[in-house]
Each structure stands twice: as structure tokens, then as C-alpha cells.
Amino acid sequence: MQPTLAPAPHPSMQTSAQDHADQVLHDQLLAAHQHLSHPQQARPQGPTAQPPHMQPNTTSPRDQNNIDPAISGAAMLSGPPQTPPQPEPTGQESPKTYGKRPLSTSKRAAQNRAAQRAFRQRKESYIRKLEEQVKEFDNTNETMKQLQAENYQLREYIINLQSRLLDSQGEVPELPGNIDLNQPRNDISVPPPGAPAATGPAPGPGGAPQQMQVPNPGAATNEDMNSLNRIAVAGLGMRKHPNEEANFLGNNFQARRPRNDDGQPDGSEATKTEPGHGLPVVS
């Protein structure tokens, strides 16, 4: 018994199946192209219902009997439509992590720049402070050197003053400018001892001769000169040598004048005494 062959499919049916396969292939290529052009927009989605034209060709066994074996074999060989391999998504956190890293890096870089700027400012301020301290130290050093030099000068001046003071303690004070000791002194003229100092009236008869004392102008002149000599000696602050004073007194004055025959001293005679200081005093 020979098996009965299925009737040949109608040509219109073959054309429709071919168009359906072309449409499915075209949709698959278009979807793959869109997926490659927009990879970031791809999100894992659950299985969704495919449109009717993209669903696999599932026919009942009764319909398969009516399909041409050539067409059915090509369809079976082609198998279900396969989508091109899609890149596996790294997860939903990968875009967020990728978006956060540049932000974190920028913040860290900004913090580093701020820290470096603050460090430079502190370094510059510290350097300026050190420079000011160095200037103050230099000024203080110069002042100290000046004070040290002035101290040395004052020490030398004090030593010089001390040496001069020691030398001047044993010296005689200087004379005034209007006095010259080298100039010879003029001796005072005194009347000779034999000359009568004054003339008295003639003695009356029967009575002792009486002599009246008359002021002697020579004695007053001697007193004035002696006073001037004492003032000059006191002003000079120097004591005369005793021999010189004795010679001066011996040349200018006489100790006593001879008495008259009557035993009465002459009226012009002046009694002179020498005190302990060596200056003549007229009484």
C-alpha cells in the first residue's frame, strides 16, 4: 500500500511564507542595529510578548502536512529567529558608579588644590616673619656694635682723666693772667733813721722838754704797702721763703732807732712786731 502524498501547496501560500520570513529577518536586523547604536539605553527587560509577525512559526501538525516539504525543511533548518549577542549589562549600579567617580575625583582634586594653596600661604607668611626677624637682628647687632665702640671710648676718656687728676694733685695751681712773678718789685723808700721826723716847739725854761708826736706820713704809706702785700700773697696762695722775707724786712725797715741824749725815743720811731706768719705788722 503506497502512502498518499499530500497535495502540493498553493503558490500563494509559498509567497506568503517567504514574505513572512523576510519580514522577521528585517525586524531582527533593525533591532540589532538600534541596540548597537544605543548601548546605554539598553536595560534588562523581562520577556515580553513578541508581535504576531515576530513570533515563531508554530503550526499545527495538520497545517504542517499541507506545507511543502522544501519550504518546511528550509524553515526548520533556519530554526527560530536568533537575536544577535547583546553585551551583558554590568548592573544597574555601574552607570551610577561611573557617574560618581568623576565627581569624587574632582572633589579630591579641589581639596588637594585648597590644601596646597593654604600651605603656600603659610609658608610665605612664615618666610616673611623670618625675614623681619633677621632685619631686627641685624639692626640690634649694629646698635650693639655702636654702643660697644662708645663704651671703649668712654673707658679711654675716664682713664685719661684719672691719669691727669693724679698728675695734677702734686702741682701748684696756675697763676692768674694779670700777675707775673718774674717781674722785679720796686723797693719802698723809707727815710733814713738819723733824719728828724718832725720839729717840735722849744722847751720852756724850768721844765722838761716835751715833744709832741706828729703823724708821720711815711708810716701810713708803709702800712698801705704792707696791706697790699698781704692781699697779694693771700691771693697767690703761696708762702714766701723765710730768708727772702727776712732780707726784705732788713733792707726796708730798721728794728729800732737810736735814742736821744735825753733818753726819750724819737717821735718818728714806730714799734714793729713780727707775728708768726712772717708778715710785718705796724702798731
Curated annotation (Swiss-Prot):
Localization per record: Nucleus
Xref: PANTHER family: TRANSCRIPTION FACTOR KAPC-RELATED (PTHR40621:SF11)
Function of the protein: Putative transcription factor.
Main location: nucleus
Record's protein name: Putative transcription factor kapC
Gene designation: kapC
Composition skew (Low complexity), residue ranges: 26-42, 108-118
Organism encoding this protein: Aspergillus niger (strain ATCC MYA-4892 / CBS 513.88 / FGSC A1513)
Region (Disordered): 1-121, 178-283
Cross-referenced SUPFAM superfamilies: Leucine zipper domain
Region of interest (Basic motif), residue spans: 103-126
